[in-house]
Amino acid sequence: MSTTQSERLRGLLEPLVSAQQLDLEEIEVSRAGRRGVLRIIVDSEEGVELDACAELSRAISEKLDETDAMGEGEYVLEVSSPGADRPLTEHRHYVRATGRLARFHLAGDGSGELVARILAVDEEGLDLEVPGVKGRKPTARRLAFDEIARARVEIEFNRKDKKEEEA
């Protein structure tokens, strides 16, 4: 059975990422001219600090230099967090997005698209708060995971944090 370069890299790098209490979200190998590009996306419950990315990048670079996982040619290594508008693809992503606004593309004939705040997450699905339209109050909605085709966190520029709401 053949393994892809990404699978080999995942096996090699996952222990390094886990040792820093981070989750390995994605590995992407591509080309930029004559150089290879290795993009590694990591995350954690608390988010990822820039210093953690830099430290992990050094550890990964050392490990890759010890092996031939990236071949003999030159490559660029990029280690980063998933970003503010990350796609939600795993249960832990939804848990981390609790309290945030998300855009859901519904599966099948589920009426297309829904924007709602994630209030709670369990093994079967999500409890959501759908914002009211034209002065109406928000409504509660339950959404099962199998009803979701795609989901992504929405960036909110004018959201008050909890301290502001309590004041």
From Swiss-Prot:
Entry annotated with the keyword Cytoplasm: yes
Which superkingdom is the protein from?
Bacteria
Q: Which GO terms describe its cellular component?
A: cytosol
Q: Does the keyword Membrane apply?
A: no
Q: Which GO terms describe its biological process?
A: ribosomal small subunit assembly; translation
Stored InterPro entries:
Ribosome_maturation_RimP, RimP_C, RimP_C_sf, RimP_N, RimP_N_sf
Where is it predominantly found?
Answer: cytoplasm
| Compartment(s) where it occurs, according to its Swiss-Prot or TrEMBL record | Cytoplasm
Q: Name one Pfam family in it.
A: DUF150_C
Which keywords belong to this entry? Cytoplasm, Ribosome biogenesis
The record's CDD domains line, in alphabetical order, gives: YlxS_C
Q: What does this protein do?
A: Required for maturation of 30S ribosomal subunits.
Q: Which PANTHER family match?
A: RIBOSOME MATURATION FACTOR RIMP (PTHR33867:SF1)
The family line of this record is: Belongs to the RimP family.
> By what name is this protein known?
Ribosome maturation factor RimP
User: Which taxonomic lineage does the organism of this UniProt entry have?
Assistant: Bacteria, Bacillati, Actinomycetota, Actinomycetes, Kitasatosporales
